[in-house]
Swiss-Prot record:
The lineage of its organism: Bacteria, Pseudomonadati, Pseudomonadota, Gammaproteobacteria, Pseudomonadales. The gene is rsgA. Binds 1 zinc ion per subunit. This is Small ribosomal subunit biogenesis GTPase RsgA. It is an enzyme of class 3 (hydrolase). GO terms for biological process: ribosomal small subunit biogenesis. It comes from Pseudomonas syringae pv. syringae (strain B728a).
Amino acid sequence: MAKRQLNRRQNWRIEKIQGERAARAAKRESATLETLEGGDLGPEQTGLVIAHFGVQVEVEAQEGEVTGQVFRCHLRANLPALVTGDRVVWRAGNQGIGVIVAQLPRTTELRRPDSRGQLKPVAANVDLIVIVFAPMPEPHANLIDRYLVAAEHAGIRPLLLLNKADLIDEQNAPALNALLAVYRTLGYPVLEVSAHHGDGMQSLQSQLDGHISVFVGQSGVGKSSLVNSLLPETDTRVGPLSEVSGQGTHTTTTARLFHFPRGGDLIDSPGIREFGLGHVSRADVEAGFIEFNDLIGTCRFRDCKHDREPGCALLKGLEDGRVQQQRMNSYRSIIASLPQDSY
């Protein structure tokens, strides 16, 4: 059934109702915060945000006698938006409730535009972004390349992970091998694993140890299954593929941080169908295609759009094999999706 289209007045009314609900929730939260701060709060200490639930977050204590314990914390109104992976200063209250009083500086930030085009952080202090895809649902180079551009733009090292390797067969093997070969040639690390059978999971674990990682990828590629395999004690629900669309049903409802026994953390974030890049410029996208680095700026014309212009270095690179057609197609698709003012 086609999705119902809402007119402007209906959209306005929905936003008005949502705004009123948010205001009521904020008022209740403010009253709770006043009660807490009016009571006996403990000293300031550092903590790690391991989950976010609207106006509250779960914080793991990082020092003192309560190190490792988890507290549900309220947020002061003057704080910026917090996300899983943030390091904060907080004070403990009664009955396992606390108050966050400050956000510590982030080393990295992974952001994406929300439905209104506003930038929204989704994870903080990450140093490894694991781009997960699988034989089913069919992987798309354009989506993988969007993640790679986002990783390069954020300064976060990427790892390409083909999950469900046990589903590779004679029909899909040629296309998958060709896809992986492009990224291996570029120097990106690529792993093939099967969370279901356990193949390659030790190699994946060694890549994750000592890092703060986040799994990204469309729904149905097995991110939750990977978490369950890496951390059997977790309770991450796994959803089946939709029989109608062949895409995954969303299971994880909030980004959550897990610890590995040998050190390092994993942030399991909600599955998303497409990673928006409306917040980046044309130059950012070009910088995100690492094989372009030696070519950008060498075109005959300074305002070259790398389409049909004579003397275009990227088109020459395409002819010479330095640039793969698959990547050029992704680049053009991403550029076409950017707002006009990003050019």
